[in-house]
């Protein structure tokens, strides 16, 4: 649908493009079919870049010359259709993007700038070419809720009048939004608002509310950190904790350090955090109490400095050990003569020393096996886990390890009178109880 721009924008010097014409829904749908599919748009709902050549010629415009028909733009306004010809952009239509922006910023003719903005940012009629007279454009939108304010203002002369990719007048507004037009749409903006908008701030100065698009964005998560410190004078039942809330970790840590831990005048370094497992056992130094409180607050102030790692630690000692995984440093050598193994931390070296001393301090609670290293015990516990999930009565029989105690194999035809006299129901209960004992949480022993 071609609109007469002259009567709408007399103040900004935009002359008329030509006689105003109205096209029926059938004509618009036929143009959709006639244009075919092009790389930039599926139909008439693409951006209208500029009027056709004879439209500009009839208006006597000299700022911009004609543009070749194509990209669902020129044929939308002309009377003659050329389905077989889809031209490229005319070199004279816009000499460059710079010239276009200069004109819009006031360096060129005001009428030319207004004409350019009217043609570039206006949405042509059309969309997915549906049935004739179909005006439910919101059904074809990615965010249909963005057009809910204009969903009820459909024009009988417009097919799929909403712009397919637009945000209800945010960046590519319809021309009807800036003045009274032939379409009976009641839009959000009046004609005087047209004078002050630039090429990139359309609908930014007078935005309605926070913007319809922002309701689809994730709301910021409000983090509440609660202080669970119990003052010594409030230890009597019922215990009452501090319960002050903070939005950042820094605020919580500062509060606990200043208000509860205290300064050097404090001689007793005791953690009074709610449900602390130390149960009032004091620390020998204040820095140890501060480090311990990070277990409750979750503070980890020591990030790994190596790019791409992203790990953070609550203790500087743990960060120092971790950085050796990046540098490859292994300062702890095995003290056993003839062994050249080196380790990044002393605890790994201590675990390794059990190999030489034949000590096996890591015992399995399900059987009599013991191991020199906790990793070996963890592998062994997986055998018990798999056997407890299966139907084998004895995990040691399928463990794959040689055990010092041979497994006891219970035959179905055993001579044990107690076993043979069990009823099916009682044997089922016995079988279930045995599996429940084996299906304990094995990870709680060794991590």
UniProtKB/Swiss-Prot annotation:
Disruption phenotype: Mice show a cell mass decrease of the spinal dorsal horn, hypoplasia and abnormal foliation patterns in the cerebellum.
Domain notes: The C2H2-type 3, 4 and 5 zinc finger domains are necessary for transcription activation.
Compartments, record wording: Nucleus; Cytoplasm
GO MF terms held by the record: DNA-binding transcription activator activity, RNA polymerase II-specific; DNA-binding transcription factor activity; RNA polymerase II cis-regulatory region sequence-specific DNA binding; RNA polymerase II transcription regulatory region sequence-specific DNA binding; zinc ion binding
Biological process, per Gene Ontology: adult walking behavior; brain development; cell differentiation; central nervous system development; forebrain development; gene expression; hippocampus development; inner ear morphogenesis
Tissue: Expressed in osteoblasts (at protein level). Expressed in the CNS. A high level expression is seen in the cerebellum, while a low level expression is seen in the olfactory bulb, diencephalon, and brainstem. Expressed in lumbar spine and iliac crest.
Annotated family: Belongs to the GLI C2H2-type zinc-finger protein family.
Protein name: Zinc finger protein ZIC 1
Superkingdom, taxonomy of origin: Eukaryota
Source organism: Mus musculus
């Amino acid at each position: 649908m071609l609109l007469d721009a002259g009567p709408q924008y007399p103040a900004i010097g935009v002359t008329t493009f030509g006689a105003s014409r109205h096209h029926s829904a059938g004509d618009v749908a036929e143009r959709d079919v006639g244009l075919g599919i092009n790389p930039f748009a599926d139909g008439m709902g693409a951006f209208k870049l500029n009027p056709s050549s004879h439209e500009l010629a009839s208006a006597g415009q000299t700022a911009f010359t004609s543009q070749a028909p194509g990209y669902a733009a020129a044929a939308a306004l002309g009377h003659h259709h050329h389905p077989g010809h889809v031209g490229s952009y005319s070199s004279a239509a816009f000499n460059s993007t710079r010239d276009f922006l200069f004109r819009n910023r006031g360096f060129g003719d005001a009428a030319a700038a207004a004409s350019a903005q009217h043609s570039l940012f206006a949405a042509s009629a059309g969309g997915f070419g549906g049935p004739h007279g179909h005006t439910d454009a919101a059904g074809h939108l990615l965010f249909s809720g963005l057009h809910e304010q204009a969903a009820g203002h459909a024009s009988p002369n417009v097919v799929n009048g909403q712009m397919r990719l637009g945000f209800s007048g945010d960046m590519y507004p319809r021309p009807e939004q800036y003045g009274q037009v032939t379409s009976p749409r009641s839009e959000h903006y009046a004609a005087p608002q047209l004078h002050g908008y630039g090429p990139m701030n359309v609908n930014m100065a007078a935005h309605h509310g926070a913007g319809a698009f922002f309701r689809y964005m994730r709301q910021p998560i409000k983090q509440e950190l609660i202080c669970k410190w119990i003052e010594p004078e409030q230890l009597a039942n019922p215990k009452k904790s501090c319960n002050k809330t903070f939005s950042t970790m820094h605020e919580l840590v500062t509060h606990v350090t200043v208000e509860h831990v205290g300064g050097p005048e404090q001689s007793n370094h005791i953690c009074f955090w709610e449900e602390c497992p130390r149960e009032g056992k004091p620390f020998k130094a204040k820095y140890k109490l501060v480090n311990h409180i990070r277990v409750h607050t979750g503070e980890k102030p020591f990030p790994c400095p190596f790019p791409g790692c992203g790990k953070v630690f609550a203790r500087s000692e743990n960060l120092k050990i971790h950085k050796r995984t990046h540098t490859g440093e292994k300062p702890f050598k095995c003290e056993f003569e003839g062994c050249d193994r080196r380790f990044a931390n002393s605890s790994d070296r201590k675990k390794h020393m059990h190999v030489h001393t034949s000590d096996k301090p890591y015992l399995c609670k399900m059987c009599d096996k013991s191991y020199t290293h906790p990793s070996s015990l963890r592998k062994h516990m997986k055998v018990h886990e798999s056997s407890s999930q299966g139907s084998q009565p004895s995990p040691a029989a399928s463990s794959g390890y040689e055990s010092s105690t041979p497994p006891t194999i219970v035959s179905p035809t055993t001579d044990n009178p107690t076993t043979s006299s069990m009823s099916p129901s009682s044997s089922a209960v016995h079988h279930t109880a045995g599996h429940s004992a084996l299906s304990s949480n094995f990870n709680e022993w060794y991590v």
